[in-house]
């Protein structure tokens, strides 16, 4: 299995609130980056290695909006150009570190790790529910010791809820329900409806109405690592499958995974809802509950990665339930192939 990831893509690097006027290091797609918020509020993202001796700039300090290397005091501005060298007046014109394109959107800081000429802000994944006033919610970041694509696999096939999350969001109906898969050049959608079923514990608590429900899970994948899941329940027979969700409760599970290395990733997630939006305690309770659910996934995924590390020649076998994940993998492979040449592109087709 390839451990490649596309570089010509926007990746979430941090929650916006985590980037302050201080040096914040993070490894993304195998590249060491240091971020900080400038005095004008804009975020700068630089290669975390001094031009002089490669010491991480994150070991230094900020002087205004200038990064000062902690080893020999070279200074770099927010664009990565050296503005000071000790004991000399002339600054070598090649003295600069790479600056990465940055977009702040949907409560995340997004970095473009590839060719900066291709960094179109319009390509930032759509996660607008995360800062839409009609929706309320919150989330967290998980450092998962697995290939980011394993998290994508996990989210594209929610059959596992029956077996991993039976005490909260899963029950037998999830594993047995039929589903549809559609796909585009950089997107995959998996749609699953479960009609006239018993609500699992989490959704029963949210709906607060007795009786059978119609439940939906509509998974939207945006390459290379964003998965937004439209979820909810409504009393059975009240029109939800036909488009009227007014009698139910609706949420979105927003997920975006950023490769750190070939076998580790940063997993940013949030759960947002369009009901009881002013209840901060509910926001906190759901966030902590979902964090517990995702910890169950983390245990499984890290165990899976360890098994893969120990058995590098073993391959995956696919079931019908893997259709969404398989298409997501194909989309990612094609993105990588476009960056690495025609031979790789042919292999991805």
Predicted regions and their residues:
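C-terminal catalytic domain of Rieske-type non-heme iron oxygenases
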Residues: 42, 121-349
């Amino acid at each position: 299995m390839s451990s490649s990831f596309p570089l010509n893509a926007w990746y979430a690097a941090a929650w916006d609130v985590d980037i302050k006027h201080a040096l914040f290091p993070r490894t993304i797609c195998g590249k060491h980056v240091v971020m900080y918020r400038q005095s004008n509020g804009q975020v700068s993202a630089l290669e975390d290695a001094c031009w002089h001796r490669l010491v991480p700039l994150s070991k230094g300090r900020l002087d205004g909006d200038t990064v000062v290397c902690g080893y020999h005091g070279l200074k770099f501005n927010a664009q990565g150009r050296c503005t000071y060298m000790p004991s000399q007046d002339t600054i070598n014109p090649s003295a600069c570190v790479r600056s990465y394109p940055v977009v702040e959107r949907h409560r995340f800081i997004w970095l473009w790790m590839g060719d900066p000429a291709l960094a179109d802000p319009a390509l930032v994944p759509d996660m607008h529910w995360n800062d839409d006033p009609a929706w309320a919610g919150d989330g967290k970041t998980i450092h998962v010791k697995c290939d980011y694509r394993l998290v994508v696999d996990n989210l594209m096939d929610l059959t596992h809820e029956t077996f991993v999350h039976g005490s909260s969001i899963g029950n037998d109906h999830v594993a047995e329900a039929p589903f549809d898969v559609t796909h585009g050049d950089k997107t995959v959608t998996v749609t699953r409806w479960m009609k006239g079923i018993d609500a699992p514990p989490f959704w029963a608590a949210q709906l607060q109405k007795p009786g059978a429900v119609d439940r939906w899970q509509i998974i939207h994948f945006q390459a290379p690592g964003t998965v937004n899941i439209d979820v909810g329940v409504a009393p059975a027979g009240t029109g939800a499958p036909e488009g009227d969700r007014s009698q139910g409760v609706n949420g979105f599970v927003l997920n975006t995974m950023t490769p750190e290395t070939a076998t580790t990733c940063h997993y940013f997630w949030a759960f947002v809802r369009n009901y009881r939006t002013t209840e901060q305690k509910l926001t906190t309770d759901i966030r902590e509950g979902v964090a517990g659910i995702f910890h169950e996934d983390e245990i499984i995924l890290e165990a899976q990665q360890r098994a893969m590390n120990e058995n590098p020649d073993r391959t995956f076998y696919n079931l019908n339930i893997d259709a969404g994940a398989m298409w997501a993998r194909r989309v990612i492979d094609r993105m990588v192939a476009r960056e690495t040449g025609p031979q790789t592109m042919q292999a991805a087709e």
